[in-house]
Amino acid sequence: MKVVAIFLASCVLFSLIPTHLSHEEPKVAPTEELMFAPSNQPRYCRSRQVFDGSCTDRGTPRTTCFLDFLGARSASEMPKNCDCTPQPNNKRLCECSVICTDCCVKN
């Protein structure tokens, strides 16, 4: 009787081994992959704005204009590649690339 119990226990244990050793990742259906893929790419336009102060008031000229645009506009415009041009009367002209109002280019 002990031999039969040991044999059955061994069979059960050995039948479980292949399921624990297979570490395959579940396959993702192509439709699920497309659901999470970005369908639109943001389109950037150059935008200008005049601010008070010099180009180095808040660090480098690029940083100063970047921070000016963030403070004066919505962060969703995502300013980048900013340039600063000193102007008369302690002013600065900031020009940054921001997301255009029509936003995105369809793929």
From Swiss-Prot:
Top-level taxonomic group: Eukaryota
Which Gene Ontology BP annotations are present? defense response to fungus; killing of cells of another organism; signal transduction
Q: Where in the cell is it found?
A: Secreted
InterPro entries xrefs: SCRL (IPR010682)
Entry GO terms, CC: extracellular region
Protein family according to the UniProt entry: Belongs to the DEFL family.
PANTHER family linked to this entry? DEFENSIN-LIKE PROTEIN 242-RELATED (PTHR34450:SF9), DEFENSIN-LIKE PROTEIN 245-RELATED (PTHR34450)
Q: What is this protein called?
A: Defensin-like protein 242
Organism encoding this protein: Arabidopsis thaliana
